Amino acid sequence: MAGRGKTLGSGVAKKSTSRSSKAGLQFPVGRIARFLKNGKYATRVGAGAPVYLAAVLEYLAAEVLELAGNAARDNKKTRIVPRHIQLAVRNDEELSKLLGDVTIANGGVMPNIHSLLLPKKAGASKPSADED
């Protein structure tokens, strides 16, 4: 009865591959799928939804980490701290809009001095000699 699709003597089990590796992602697709199911966001969750969400989250994390790494390098540091993440997010227009209401702990504030508080230029505010 070997002709009915059954293989004889082949007891080698196929190694399972994760959905993250199938999609080429680092973020856990299975865990995100579990969160979507247990979170009661919908009664049913499609097979592609957790893969897509994992890809979006991975992209956002990579984008923030790249910009924060650049901010750390600009400050001559080798370790990314929350201040670097704050500078990276607030200097990027799209990320700042996305995370506008988010407070980053130990992030500090953006350096900003109002133009009225800056000292006057010496050459620009000189009175002219013609006025007597």
UniProtKB/Swiss-Prot annotation:
The opening ranks of the lineage are: Eukaryota, Viridiplantae, Streptophyta, Embryophyta, Tracheophyta
Query: What's the stated role of this polypeptide?
Result: Core component of nucleosome. Nucleosomes wrap and compact DNA into chromatin, limiting DNA accessibility to the cellular machineries which require DNA as a template. Histones thereby play a central role in transcription regulation, DNA repair, DNA replication and chromosomal stability. DNA accessibility is regulated via a complex set of post-translational modifications of histones, also called histone code, and nucleosome remodeling.
Q: Which UniProt keywords apply?
A: Chromosome, DNA-binding, Nucleosome core, Nucleus
Which tissues carry this protein?
Expressed mainly in non-dividing tissues of the plant. Also found in meristems and dividing cells.
Task: Give the record's subunit note.
Answer: The nucleosome is a histone octamer containing two molecules each of H2A, H2B, H3 and H4 assembled in one H3-H4 heterotetramer and two H2A-H2B heterodimers. The octamer wraps approximately 147 bp of DNA.
Q: How is it modified after translation?
A: Not ubiquitinated.
* Family stated for the protein in its record: Belongs to the histone H2A family.
Its localization reads: Nucleus; Chromosome
Which one Pfam family would you cite for this protein? Histone
Q: Which PROSITE patterns match?
A: HISTONE_H2A
Q: Which CDD domains match?
A: HFD_H2A
User: Which terms does the record give in the GO molecular function aspect?
Assistant: DNA binding; protein heterodimerization activity; structural constituent of chromatin
Known InterPro entries for this protein?
A: Histone-fold, Histone_H2A, Histone_H2A/H2B/H3, Histone_H2A_C, Histone_H2A_CS
Name-wise, this protein is Probable histone H2A.2
Q: Does the keyword Nucleus apply?
A: yes
- Top-rank lineage group of the source organism: Eukaryota
Query: What is the species of this protein?
Result: Arabidopsis thaliana (Mouse-ear cress)
Any one GO cellular component localisation term in the record: nucleosome
**Keyword DNA-binding assigned:** yes
